[in-house]
Regions:
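Beta1/beta-strand and adjacent pyrophosphate-binding region of the FAD-binding site
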Residues: 5-19, 36
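Conserved mid-domain beta->alpha element of the FAD-binding
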Residues: 25-29, 340-353
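Glycine-rich FAD pyrophosphate-binding loop
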Residues: 28-48
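Dinucleotide-binding Rossmann-like beta1-alpha1 core, especially the glycine-rich loop
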Residues: 52-131, 252-255, 262-264, 285, ...
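Short beta-strand to alpha-helix junction loop
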Residues: 66-69, 95-105, 144-166, 173, ...
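Helical element adjacent to the flavin cofactor pocket in flavoenzyme catalytic cores
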Residues: 144-201, 210
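Central helical "cap/lid" subdomain
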Residues: 197-244
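Active-site lid/adjacent beta-loop-alpha segment flanking the redox-cofactor pocket in flavoenzymes
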Residues: 221, 236-348
Length: 353
C-alpha cells in the first residue's frame, strides 16, 4: 500500500518526467528536503519514455550552452552516484554541412561554444567519413566534432535522478492527478488532487505536454503545444559501439546507434512544419502511448537518411515510432517564475531538439 499524501510540503513538483525528476534531484542537492513530486501516471510517462536521448552541447546562445554543458557533466557521473544505470554513452558527435552557409553557421557556433569552454573542432570531410564509415560525404563541404557529446536512455536517466532525489529526502507519489492550484492574494497556497489537498509554499509545473493545462488552472499562460515526433530503428547493420551520433541540419535529421537493438541505427528528424496533436487537450491517460504511424509524413526524412547513409536502404526498418512532444513558439525553454502568480514556477518546453 502506498503512503498517504502529506498535508503540507514546502515545494510541490507536478510531473514525473525527466524534467520533474531533475528539479526534485537538484532541489535536494540544494538542501531542500520538504519536496513532493506528484505524477499522474508512472514516472517517465508522456514524452520521456520514448525520447531519442541525444546529448549535445551545440547551441546558439551562451545561456543554453551553459545548461547543456552542465547536463553532460551530470550524466557522466549520475550512474556512479545513484547506482541506477542511465545508459549514458559519451561517444562524441559529428554535425555535417552541405552548404557554405551552413558551414559558416557551424563555425560561428563553434566560436561561441569554445568561449564557454566546450571542446569542439572543425574537421575535414575525410575525417568525418573516417568517423562514420557508412556516411556519404561527396556532397558535404565540412563538419564539426564535439568529443564529449553522447547519448543516453532518457527513462533510465530520469529514474536515476528520481532515486537521487529520494535519497536526498524528497517524496515521490505516482498515480496522483492534480486537479487545481490553490491561490491566495496573488500567490500559490497549495494544490488540489484526486486524493486530497496539499498546502505548499511553491509549485513547480513540470507537466510536459500538460504544462499548458496546468497553467490554466491558475491563470498562468504556458505557451507550448504538442506535436507529433517520429523516428525509426533499422534492422541490425553492424553499427559498432562507440560510434558518434550524427546530425545533418540541412536535412533536419539525426542518427545514433540504437542502445537496445545491437548494431542498429536510430534515425529521426524535425520538420519545419510539424503535425500538431492534442489541440483539444492532452488525454490524461496518454502515458506510455504511441500514435498511428504516418509514413507519408516521415518519408522525406527517410529519403534524406538513405541519401546520407545509403546502407540503411538495404538494412530495412525494424521499428517506427510516432508519439508526441511539446514545443514552444520560439523553440526555447520556459524556465522561471510565472509573472501572473507568485511562487508558481514553470520548467517546460524541453524536448528532443
Amino acid at each position: 500500500m502506498s503512503a498517504p499524501l502529506p498535508h503540507h510540503a514546502q515545494i510541490i513538483i507536478i510531473g514525473g518526467g525527466i524534467v520533474g525528476c531533475s528539479v526534485a534531484y537538484h532541489l535536494t542537492k540544494l538542501g531542500r528536503k520538504d519536496v513532493v513530486l506528484l505524477e499522474q501516471g508512472e514516472l517517465t510517462g508522456g514524452t520521456t519514455w520514448h525520447a531519442a536521448g541525444l546529448v549535445t552541447q551545440l547551441r546558439n546562445s551562451h545561456t543554453l550552452i551553459e545548461i547543456v554543458k552542465y547536463g553532460v557533466d551530470l550524466y557522466s557521473r549520475l550512474e556512479a552516484e545513484t547506482g541506477q544505470p542511465t545508459g549514458f554513452d559519451q561517444t562524441g558527435s559529428i554535425t555535417v554541412a552541405r552548404t557554405e552557409g551552413r558551414m559558416d553557421e557551424l563555425k560561428k557556433i563553434t566560436s561561441l561554444a569554445r568561449a564557454s569552454g566546450i571542446e569542439i573542432e572543425p574537421i575535414t570531410i575525410r575525417e568525418a567519413g573516417e568517423m562514420w564509415p557508412l556516411m556519404r560525404t561527396d556532397d558535404l563541404v565540412g563538419a564539426i566534432h564535439i568529443p564529449k557529446d553522447g547519448q543516453t536512455l532518457p527513462a533510465e536517466t530520469a529514474k536515476a535522478m528520481a532515486k537521487g532525489a529520494k535519497d536526498g529526502g524528497a517524496s515521490i507519489f505516482e498515480g496522483v492527478s492534480v486537479t487545481g492550484i490553490r491561490r491566495s492574494e496573488g500567490a500559490v497556497k497549495g494544490v488540489s488532487t484526486d486524493q486530497g489537498d496539499i498546502e505548499c509554499e511553491v509549485v513547480v509545473n513540470c507537466g510536459g505536454m500538460w504544462s499548458r493545462e496546468i497553467g490554466l488552472m491558475c491563470g498562468v499562460a504556458v505557451p507550448l503545444h504538442a506535436a507529433e515526433h517520429m523516428y525509426l530503428v533499422t534492422n541490425p547493420m553492424g553499427i559498432p559501439k562507440g560510434i558518434r551520433s550524427l546530425r545533418d541540419p540541412d536535412e533536419q535529421i539525426y542518427f545514433r546507434r540504437d542502445l537496445e537493438e545491437e548494431g542498429a541505427i536510430l534515425m529521426g528528424g524535425f520538420e519545419s512544419v510539424a503535425k500538431p496533436w492534442g489541440m483539444n487537450g492532452i488525454p490524461d491517460d496518454y502515458i506510455f502511448s504511441l500514435l498511428e504511424p504516418d509514413w507519408e509524413h516521415f518519408k522525406v526524412f527517410w529519403e534524406s537518411a538513405v541519401n546520407r547513409v545509403p546502407a540503411m536502404k538495404d538494412a530495412g526498418i525494424n521499428r517506427f515510432y510516432v508519439s508526441a512532444e511539446s514545443f514552444t513558439p520560439d523553440n526555447r525553454y520556459i524556465l522561471g517564475e510565472a509573472p501572473e502568480l507568485k511562487n508558481f514556477f514553470v520548467a517546460a518546453g524541453l524536448n528532443s531538439t
